[in-house]
From Swiss-Prot:
It comes from Aspergillus oryzae (strain ATCC 42149 / RIB 40). Pfam families: SRA1, WD40. One of its GO terms (biological process) is endoplasmic reticulum organization. Residues 1140-1150 have a biased composition (Polar residues). One of its GO terms (molecular function) is structural molecule activity. This is Protein transport protein sec31. Component of the coat protein complex II (COPII) which promotes the formation of transport vesicles from the endoplasmic reticulum (ER). The coat has two main functions, the physical deformation of the endoplasmic reticulum membrane into vesicles and the selection of cargo molecules. Belongs to the WD repeat SEC31 family. It is found in: Cytoplasmic vesicle, COPII-coated vesicle membrane; Endoplasmic reticulum membrane. Residues 488-509, 796-829, 881-1168 are annotated as: Disordered.
């Protein structure tokens, strides 16, 4: 019941029609006195602004129109000719006024009045537009006048009924299903149903003695049902009528304490009815059942009108004479029940202690028992992972049965189609066609260039392809000669002589070549002369030494004669004879050539640039070109790399050149170089570098597309850009055979940005139903990537194939298992009943020998090697029942085989079978209220059991006590009303239920505490010695035969009269399987803590362990005789050793019975001096908290105080807490006193962790005290 808005007016009101933001029209209530005694009457329009957060400011009207009279009623209807509809006002003066709402809102008040008619001789009390024909308006008023007006002819309405009536029509309502039916209610008690079509009365209801009628309302769905209300203070009734029986009301709704003034039946849900009246209250009813759901916040004066919002029934408004119109919701956001649960579960940490309580308004609230009809969806749909939509539709309208349909769904079909096309092209392996298609359809030059470069990489010689892409292609010899001849040569430079005569085609020479080898005509015959035959003689003799040689000439000659080309080279280089040096080097081999080249390049400091390039090429040092060449010549550098770079250095050289281009981009902000850098990174297969550029281009292209897009959505634009990136990366990886070496790393990935895009793209294609494609790209992401791990799990769950599952074991009426998920016992083998003590029953000299094991019984199942150790036997459990000397043969059952599927004992949770207690005999007193009622049937199919390792709703150690939470409803194999087989000679005696091992997969049950709760009281033993009757079962459903026990049976006190063990049944093939032993509660308070709590000591007589379920075909046991011995001998075996904590001294000895406290609870006179600060500080702080805590936390504060008193009792008795713990608790108390809550928490955690045996319920109180004290200023 959240009050959304308040209109500060005493006025009648009407909601605006339509789905727009709701407006309310108000008209000053006739006869009402304002706070300032103003006589002003007006029509006002209010914008509630429910779409904006309330600022606490008082609402102001958006339109106002003064009138000459007050209003009794208002109505607002939609209209085709008027944008915001027409408002009709019923004035006290008898005038019917119509306004155009749109003109009122726009400020045209002078033109807003549509019409003003005065057909009524007195005040108009009520009016309403026809819900099916908005042009028809019914008005009723004084002297029984009832008019029907047509808005197309308002001046000429027609009247219904006779002209002479002394009563007034107080209310009216059009039928919601039959358009021409109208009902009116008068002050004389007449409820008349009119047929407007025939202009006659249809019938008149006997309104229970002609009591005045203040309100009427039709059922929104049933045309024959309506409700009426009486304004009498002595008899405030609401009558529900069915016109098929108009003599008496169908139902009477009683709840108002004074007269009812207004009714409003929700048009969206016929189960909701609002009523308001003179008792200042507004109630919500279910008129179909007569049940009152609850009441809304009470006001200070009469509530004379209440109305549902016609379009959004979540809101309604109520007008009262306290000068306010309250707009509120039908449901509260936080009910008292929810608040109580929240209070119990609140952690009480920090400022949350008060924050939550202070935000809850102290108002009445209630919660609807079922969802309103407009929230009951007849259909629904939800998006499922993997491009699926799950929809739910009714099989047939009006039925509750639904059908579920799963259909594929794609946000953008183009995305799915392009994904399929690309994946198919990849499977075919035609990468070149993909590149050509993408390059042809590229939106930008950069994208086109990328695809061209990738296409070049696909060629047989990628380097040659890259050089050709840059424009460096191989040339023929003639083309090279032509270009060389045209390098700036106009005339031959021949020292002023005319050019030599051409020597035929192909004789074009460079001027330098010509000057070097064209010195004399004899030079042409030089080579031919050298090639003379062996015997030929020439006429060109020469001297090796002619006497004019220099020393250098002589040295070179001698070296050549001796074949010492290296020495000859040294002399030539020393004399700077480079031409001779190169000729000698050619003869001397590669070593000499390298030496000559090195000397040559060292001398060419002022030589042309190509010499330095040649030096880098010859010296295989292209790094000089990469790092030092001007970036305007990056293409030439790249061509040189493609031509001369070694394979192992090529990628790094391209990477270095690309880095230089990126630095230039950052320095000059010239993004045109980005394409050049991308080329370098592509050529060098540097995926991490090129991906960064592509992602940046993706964002820019996406932004441009958003600015120019006409019909595309932002999602489609983004996905197309993302898909283009993924396609380029995928093709590039395949072409370059890229290997990601960082997939095993856990962080700091170089391709982190690409991994994010892979994950995003996988999510997109998965949304379009391509789960396999999504899985392929997720496999490219490192395994340790957190987001990829989540995405992989989703894909894995969505694509997993259903596996054959073992069906749950079910039992037929004869107890034969249909399936075998569990090891079964022999159907003809006697079953053993539950015994909390692991010792066997003592043999009886009168009992026959136990039957031998059936040779055909299945072998015992092996013990589960992975199960935890069995729970320690409860030291307070009764011993095994003694063998009955009168038991029939076969009563003693052999040991049952171990169930490998049963949950291991010793955990905090182990389900056991339901174990009812047999009715006491021999005059034993009846059981307390804590004993569960007997079951109604014993042939229920076993429920599945979830082991403690897989259960998800296991209770925690500090949860609510057992019994506070509702147990889950058990599943039944048979109806609840099925009769149980008779297992007792007395018809009213409680039957017992067989105890069997729970099958796997059953719902989790509650834990069995090791110490049972105290009995609710003891009663004297009954005097009747006849067989007692069973405890009558309550209205609760039959208990689950596999639910856990609410408590473990305590041990009988020595000296107390025992209850004889029930007679065991003989072997039967229909007995249920044996039960599991109950586990001990490792979270129960220690024995010392139990000793300090007097509530845990008193125990009433305890029933014996339950017996196996009786078979309807087994022989009936003999009736308990009153002459039987009152106390058969009890035999008890030695107590078993505890196994709950192996290896510790405390767990290997039997815990003694709790000792009686030395001093009564509440006594504080014996607290030692070293512990006195604990008591003084903690109790004082607790009193401070009590005085400042909000009332909503009263329960938590009292619980903390009670637990602290347990601590003080231990301190007073000097038990449980050891001296070092007392010292630590004193330090904790001083820390709380000093407001050092972190230190207090640290001490608390240390005690709780390392000294568990000294902790009890008081530790929870200390923890809560720390939290409360910190939250309390």
């Amino acid at each position: 019941m959240v009050r959304l808005r308040e209109i500060p007016r005493t006025a009648t009101f009407a909601w605006s029609p339509g789905a727009a933001s709701p407006l309310i029209a108000t008209g000053t209530r006739a006869g009402a006195v304002d706070v300032d005694f103003s006589n002003e009457t007006c029509l006002e329009l209010w914008d509630l602004g429910l779409d904006r957060q309330s600022t606490g400011e008082e609402l102001q009207p958006i339109a106002k129109f003064d009138t000459d009279s007050g209003f009794n009623d208002l109505a607002w209807t939609p209209s085709e000719d008027n944008t915001r509809g027409i408002i009709a006002g019923a004035l006290e003066s008898g005038s019917l006024d119509l306004w155009d709402a749109d003109k009122l809102i726009n400020g045209s008040s002078d033109d807003a009045v549509i019409s003003r008619t005065s057909k009524h001789s007195g005040a108009i009390k009520a009016l309403q537009f026809n819900p099916r024909h908005s042009n028809l308006l019914a008005t009723g008023g004084a002297k029984g006048e009832l008019y029907i007006s047509d808005l197309n002819n308002v001046a000429n309405p027609y009247r219904l009924g006779t002209a002479a009536r002394a009563d007034d029509i107080e209310c009216l309502d059009w039928n919601k299903k039959v358009a021409h039916i109208l009902v009116t209610g008068s002050s004389a008690g007449f409820v008349t149903v009119w047929d407007v079509k025939t202009k006659k009365e249809s019938l008149t209801l006997n309104n229970m003695g002609r009591k005045a009628v203040s309100a009427v309302a039709w059922d929104p769905e049933k045309p024959t049902k309506l409700v009426t209300a009486t304004p009498l203070e002595s008899d405030p009734m609401i009558y529900v009528w069915d016109l098929r029986n108009s003599h008496a009301p169908e139902r009477v709704l009683k709840g108002h304490e004074s007269g009812v003034l207004s009714l409003s039946w929700c048009s969206h849900d016929p189960d909701l009815l609002l009523s308001s009246g003179k008792d200042n209250r507004t109630l919500c009813w279910n008129p179909q059942t007569g049940h009152a759901y609850g009441e809304f916040p009470v006001v200070t004066n009469w509530t004379f009108q209440t109305r549902w919002n016609p379009h959004n029934p979540n809101f309604f408004a109520t007008a009262s004479f306290d000068g306010k119109i309250a707009v509120q919701t039908v449901q509260n956001t936080s009910t008292d029940t929810a608040q109580a649960i929240a209070d119990q579960n609140q952690a009480l940490d920090g400022e949350d202690f008060f924050a939550k309580a202070q935000t809850q308004p102290q108002v009445s609230s209630f919660s609807l028992p079922k969802a309103p009809k407009w929230l009951e969806r007849p259909c629904g749909a939800t998006f499922g992972f993997g491009g699926r939509v799950v929809s739910v539709n009714l099989v047939e309208k009006g039925q509750r049965a639904s059908k579920i349909k799963i259909t594929p769904f794609e946000v953008d079909e183009a995305v799915g189609q392009s994904t399929e096309t690309f994946e198919n092209a990849l499977k075919e392996g035609d990468l070149r066609s993909i590149c050509e298609t993408r390059a042809a359809n590229a939106a930008t030059e950069e994208e086109k260039a990328d695809w061209k470069v990738i296409q070049a990489l696909i060629s047989e010689n990628p380097r040659k392809g890259l050089a050709e892409y840059l424009g460096f292609q191989d040339q023929s010899a003639d083309e090279a000669a032509d270009k060389l001849a045209n390098l700036g040569l106009g005339k031959e430079e021949t020292n002023g002589e005319s050019p030599k005569e051409s020597r035929g085609p192909g004789a074009k020479k460079h001027k330098r070549l010509q000057s070097m080898f064209d010195a004399s005509p004899e030079a042409d015959n030089f080579l031919s002369d050298l090639a003379a035959s062996k015997g030929a003689k020439t006429n060109n003799p020469f001297h090796i030494f002619n006497g004019s040689e220099t020393e250098a000439d002589k040295g070179i000659t001698r070296a050549l004669l001796l074949g010492d080309f290296e020495k000859a080279l040294d002399v030539s280089l020393k004399e700077d004879r480079l031409s001779d040096a190169f000729m000698i080097a050619i003869c001397g081999g590669q070593k000499c050539i390298a030496k000559a080249q090195e000397h040559y390049f060292s001398k060419q400091t002022e030589s042309p640039n190509y010499v330095r390039l040649l030096a880098s090429i010859v010296g295989k040092n292209l790094w000089d070109v990469v790092y030092n060449a001007d970036l305007s010549n990056w293409k030439e550098v790249m061509a040189a790399l493609c031509t001369f770079a070694e394979e192992k250095e090529f990628a790094d050289l391209c990477d270095a050149l690309g880095d230089r281009l990126e630095e230039q981009i950052r320095a000059s902000d010239d993004k045109s170089l980005r394409k050049d850098a991308s080329f370098c990174f592509l050529a060098g297969s540097k995926l991490e570098k090129v991906v960064a550029i592509w992602i940046e281009e993706l964002r820019e292209n996406e932004q441009k597309a958003l600015e120019t897009a006409a019909n595309d959505t932002s999602f489609s634009i983004h996905v197309r850009a993302l898909q283009g990136l993924i396609e380029k990366v995928t093709i590039f990886r395949q072409v370059t055979k890229f290997q990601d070496t960082e997939r095993t790393k856990e962080s700091d990935w170089k391709l982190s940005n690409l991994y994010d895009k892979y994950i995003e793209y996988a999510d997109v294609v998965a949304t379009h139903g391509r789960l396999q494609v999504a899985q392929k790209y997720l496999d490219l992401v490192p395994e340790k990537h957190p987001e990829a791990e989540v995405a992989r799990n989703r894909i894995k769950l969505a694509t997993r194939q259903p596996t054959a599952q073992k069906t749950q074991q079910t039992t037929t009426g004869r107890g034969t298992p249909l399936n075998k998920p569990l090891p079964t016992t022999n159907a003809y083998q006697p079953q053993r009943t539950f015994s909390p003590v692991a010792t066997a029953a003592a043999p009886s000299p009168y009992a026959p020998p136990a039957p031998t094991t059936n040779a055909y019984a299945p072998p015992a199942a092996a013990t589960n090697p992975y199960a935890p150790p069995a729970a320690a036997t409860n030291p307070y459990a009764p011993p095994a029942p003694a063998s009955n000397p009168y038991a029939p043969p076969g009563a003693a059952a052999p040991p049952q085989p171990t169930n490998p599927y049963a949950p291991a004992s010793g955990g905090s949770y182990a389900p056991t079978g339901y174990q009812p207690t047999p009715a006491p005999s021999y005059g034993a007193k009846p059981l307390g209220g804590s004993v569960p009622p007997p079951p109604r049937a014993s042939n229920q199919s076993p429920a599945t059991v979830t082991t403690y390792t897989t259960a998800t709703n296991l209770p925690a150690w500090n949860d609510l006590p057992e019994g506070f939470a509702k147990a889950p409803t058990p599943r039944r194999g048979t109806p609840a009303g099925a009769a149980a087989p008779i297992s007792s000679p007395f018809p009213n005696q409680s039957p017992s239920i067989a105890q069997g091992p729970p099958p796997p997969g059953a719902p989790p049950t509650q834990r069995t505490p090791s110490v049972p709760p105290p009995p609710k009281g003891t009663a004297p033993p009954p005097r009747v010695t006849s067989p007692p009757s069973a405890i009558p079962p309550g209205p609760t459903p039959p208990p689950n035969p596999y639910a856990s026990l609410p408590q473990s049976p305590p041990q009988l006190n020595p000296g107390t009269m025992g209850v004889p063990a029930p007679i065991p049944r003989g072997p039967s093939p229909y007995n249920a399987p044996p039960s599991m032993p109950p586990p001990t509660n490792r979270y129960a308070p220690s024995p010392a803590a139990q000793a300090a709590n007097p509530q845990l000591q008193a125990r009433g007589p305890v029933p014996p362990p339950p017996q196996a379920a009786a078979s309807p075909y087994a022989p009936q046991p003999p009736a308990a005789s009153q002459y039987a011995p009152s106390t058969p001998p009890l035999q008890q075996g030695p107590p078993p050793a505890s196994t709950s904590r192996p290896g510790t001294a405390s767990s290997q000895k039997v815990t003694p019975a709790p000792a009686t406290p030395k001093y009564p609870p509440g006594d504080r006179s014996h607290i030692p001096e070293d512990a006195m600060p604990i008591y003084e500080i903690l109790s004082a702080d607790m009193q401070r908290i009590k005085g400042r805590a909000p009332t909503s936390f009263k329960q938590q504060v009292e619980d903390a105080d009670r637990r602290l008193n347990l601590l003080f009792d231990h301190l007073n008795n000097g038990d449980l807490l050891k001296p070092n713990t007392v010292s630590d608790m004193a330090d904790l108390a001083r820390a709380i006193q000093a407001r050092d809550y972190e230190a207090a928490r640290a001490i608390h955690v240390d005690i709780l962790t390392n000294r568990t045996d000294e902790c009890g319920q008081w530790m929870v109180g200390v923890k809560r005290l720390i939290s409360m004290s910190k939250a309390t200023p």
